[in-house]
Amino acid sequence: MASTASYSPSPTSQWRTQKLPKRFNFYVIHNQEFGKLSQSSSLSTSSFPKTLKLPVIHMPINNIQSQTTVCVSTDENLEELVNLQKIPNGFLNKESNKRVFIQDPPWVSSLFMNSLFVRAKQVQGVRREFREIERRRRYAMLRRRQIKAETEAWEQMVEEYRELEREMCEKKLAPNLPYVKKLLLGWFEPLRQAIEKEQNAETTVKHRAAFAPHIDSLPADKMAVIVMHKLMGLLMMGGKEERCVQVVQAAVQIGMAVENEVRIHNFLEKTKKLQKHMTGAQSQEDMSKETMILRKRVKSLIKRNRVVEVRKLMKSEEPESWGRDTQAKLGCRLLELLTETAYVQRPVDQSADTPPDIRPAFRHVFKIATRDPGKNIVKKYGVIECDPLVVAGVDRTVKQMMIPYVPMLVPPKKWRGYDKGGYLFLPSYLMRTHGSRRQQDAVRGVPTKQMQQVYEALDTLGSTKWRVNKRILNVVESIWAGGGNIAGLVDRKDVPIPELSNSDDIMEVKKWKWKVRKSKKINQELHSQRCDTELKLSVARKLKDEEGFYYPHNLDFRGRAYPMHPHLNHLSSDLCRGILEFAEGRPLGKSGLRWLKIHLASLYAGGVEKLCYDARLAFVENHIHDILDSANNPLNGNRWWLNAEDPFQCLAACINLSEALKSSSPHTVISHLPIHQDGSCNGLQHYAALGRDSMEAAAVNLVAGEKPADVYTEIALRVDHIIRGDSIKDPAIDPNALLAKLLIDQVDRKLVKQTVMTSVYGVTYVGAREQIKRRLEEKGLIDDDRLLFTASCYAAKVTLAALGELFQAARGTMTWLGDCAKVIALENQPVRWTTPLGLPVVQPYFKTQRHVIRTSLQILALQREGDAVEVRKQRTAFPPNFVHSLDGSHMMMTAVACRDAGLQFAGVHDSFWTHACDVDQMNRILREKFVELYSLPILEDLLENFQKSYPALTFPPLPKRGDFNLREVLESPYFFN
């Protein structure tokens, strides 16, 4: 239809119409041709948006052809408005006339809508651009903070001490400081002065190299802070010694910390000089990337994409490593200065007229090592002993200590080599080799392409963004402030030391001494656990307000991945796992709501985790009231969640499920909770796949079943059957009869679980005995220690025998692996192999060589890796290490595949985590990757590799393989569950 109305896509366009003399109505002219046109898109209601409002257009209708749809007026001046050659008879029939509105042709509406779409796209583009700018700004800010945390930590601590000193002098704030902070503040200035005096002393180069190398490589204040915090940190970490740490350990740790700080300090000082030597004409834009980054010391390390260049500069100018000898010598001298300057004072008794009790905070003493049976050689070792007054307040003020290698605020650097990846500036290594130079050389010598899958897997694990679950942290803080001792938290009070009675009976005195030793040992363990809890909580407190953070990962020598931060991480206890959650939230969805309920039931445990999925769902439905009460009133309600095996994780699941159930649309509720899928005795699963044994495969859920098969319960039933049989025997003939009677009704799943779990990892009889002994101690039914020991010995033998009966094929594979390792080790060679992902592994079991060095504090005996292998250790450790390398490969393969599928993924060896809505997809992936892994000729490749490496040696033939079909794993619902 022709139209003279002007149209512009602009919203401000003006509609101009020809003025008409009088009001008129518009009617459709009926014509035979109109029927065709009425069906065209120009009059179709679907050709124009119904919601779009357009102005009515008044149009001149001169020179309109008869075949065209026309709108005319029925006014008196009709002839003045319209001049048609031929008007149909029905035109002036008012009964057939219909009132309508003008509609534009399709090209007009199309043009209008296109303009709207263009504008919408432009707006979206601008918004995306602004979001990207904001994202970059946010990332740059976080990167600045991360770099500062890695490079200025010790310097900030120095400034804090100086500020506290000033405030103390001006405002007398000392009484308000935490106990340990007071101690450290009191030690800081005397130690700083002693170090400064040592640095300025006119000693010969030879003397300094012998007793205090590199002591002048850092400012005295920074070195003082490092010594104090490192030593206190070692004391808080706990260990075998009570209130003390071995000199060798402390000296080397302090020396390493100083060396790392020296590298950063020297680098920053050098860049300050570069800044001064720059010409005035050189513009800001022409400055080198390195100089821009380093301007105003670490504050200049904020420019995006500049850290790589800085790392290269540091790498190119780094001196060689000091070595353990130098680290130990420097550490010993600094420890000596601390023991000479640090004092502690008992609180003054106002009523007593006595001088203040001031004594050294630390003492250097020697202890006698445990004697070897049958040997008269007495070995002594030096320790730094801490005064009880220092210990008294340590576990309550751990938060004052500096913790290195905290989670990162930005994603870690991608791995590109042995020492290229992880933290931005802190030394980061792909593998924890513990000084094994052979393992380091093996990893460094591998082409980058061969290690690509390993790098990608570690990058995937490191790119998972976490955050602190504040609701769980608040509950933990409330319990901890109240003294702990519930929900698995350690008691904050020591057990009382028994007092000596007035009896002169020698046996009573001996019994009292034994009880005192036991109480002190318990208190020592409680102290260590309290320090560990405080370390975890201190990290959580620092991170609770962060939008998210990341865990750089690296490997142990077998290829298992671990977060580099040691305290608050998802591989740790229920406390840590409950506090942590994914930073990214995703809607639950229908399947996610189901998996959340299953997850909650599994965390509650108590046998519920071994039920089928439907039974677990029914368990949750039957406890909805308890779940809602736990979420709403975790500490003041009926506290149902405290009965769970993993209470804090269970509480987190209760809160998430409560949010969903309260919502009008549960499936759309956003969930941040990681849902776990755990392997069923994963070590035996790998052995069953290697040996293709159908019976073992069914026992560990490689085969579909109506409910999960429980290998631990199966072994417990076998052990109980054997013990009951022995209990009816004559004690005069079989001495185990009395022990069997003692153990009746004490054998359950928990008693044997740890031994069964570790049996495939090479647990020895001694290890099994200690595991079972701990479980029997927990039951508390056997008071006599000697009887407890003999009962544990008997139960361990029976458990290992039951395992051998059920898993004969796995035992055969373990024996073959051990025999191959023995053949190699007898040639004084370590066992080497390459994992399916291309990671080279060298077993680090060598006889150590003692290396004696003289320090200012004492003569130290450092141990280093020798040339002779430990044959027995090489043989016994190879089967579990090999299986660990396989489960590590499976986890890394799954991680990369989940990343490619768009899933968030976290792995804990044999436990894989993702969002609730993605569990089904992750389950499919992890099964596919398991089948893919064991479709490879793993044992055949291993034997071929051994034969190529040692052509002169004869290896035993491969163990026989069963007929289990690996693809059955794809259909097994409880393979991981």
Swiss-Prot record:
Its EC number is 2.7.7.6. Gene3D superfamilies: 1.10.287.260, 1.10.287.280, 5' to 3' exonuclease, C-terminal subdomain, DNA-directed RNA polymerase, N-terminal domain. It catalyses: RNA(n) + a ribonucleoside 5'-triphosphate = RNA(n+1) + diphosphate. The active site is at D678, K753, D910. InterPro entries: DNA-dir_RNA_pol_helix_hairp_sf (IPR024075), DNA-dir_Rpol_C_phage-type (IPR046950), DNA-dir_Rpol_phage-type (IPR002092), DNA/RNA_pol_sf (IPR043502), RNA_POL_N_sf (IPR037159), RPOL_N (IPR029262). Keywords: Chloroplast, DNA-directed RNA polymerase, Nucleotidyltransferase, Plastid, Transcription, Transferase, Transit peptide. It is an enzyme of class 2 (transferase). Residues 1-71 form a transit peptide. It comes from the Eukaryota. GO terms for molecular function: DNA binding; DNA-directed RNA polymerase activity. It holds the Pfam family RPOL_N. PROSITE patterns: RNA_POL_PHAGE_1, RNA_POL_PHAGE_2. It is found in: Plastid, Chloroplast. One of its GO terms (biological process) is mitochondrial transcription. GO terms for cellular component: chloroplast; mitochondrial DNA-directed RNA polymerase complex. DNA-dependent RNA polymerase catalyzes the transcription of DNA into RNA using the four ribonucleoside triphosphates as substrates. Belongs to the phage and mitochondrial RNA polymerase family. This is DNA-directed RNA polymerase 3B, chloroplastic.
